[in-house]
């Protein structure tokens, strides 16, 4: 399994970031070819402090090659282009092969 974890930075309007992600960006991501799993959530902390990121998404493919093909596709290009519409504060994209500890 090959995974992408996308961590979105806080911006001037976190509610707008979450709304845009829910209504526009997540549906674009769901169209990526070959995607096996796509989950996301709004970050929080157990003690109520401000979390490091506003939201985090996790996407999975069978292989790195499948992920590369997904981002090279029309759907992938649309998702990347959409980042300028809501993620101006930045997003960290971490790609890796999944290893299980269990």
Briefly describe each language-model feature range.
Residues 1-102:
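Macromolecular interaction modules
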């Amino acid at each position: 399994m090959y995974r992408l974890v996308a961590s979105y930075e806080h911006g001037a309007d976190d509610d707008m970031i979450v709304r845009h992600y829910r209504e526009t960006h997540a549906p674009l991501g769901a169209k990526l070819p070959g995607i096996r799993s796509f989950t996301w959530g709004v970050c929080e902390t157990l003690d109520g402090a401000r979390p490091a990121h506003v939201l985090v998404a996790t996407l999975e493919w069978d292989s790195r090659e499948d992920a590369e093909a997904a981002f090279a596709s029309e759907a992938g290009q649309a998702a990347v282009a959409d980042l300028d519409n809501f993620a101006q504060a930045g997003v960290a994209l971490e790609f890796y092969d999944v290893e299980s500890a269990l």
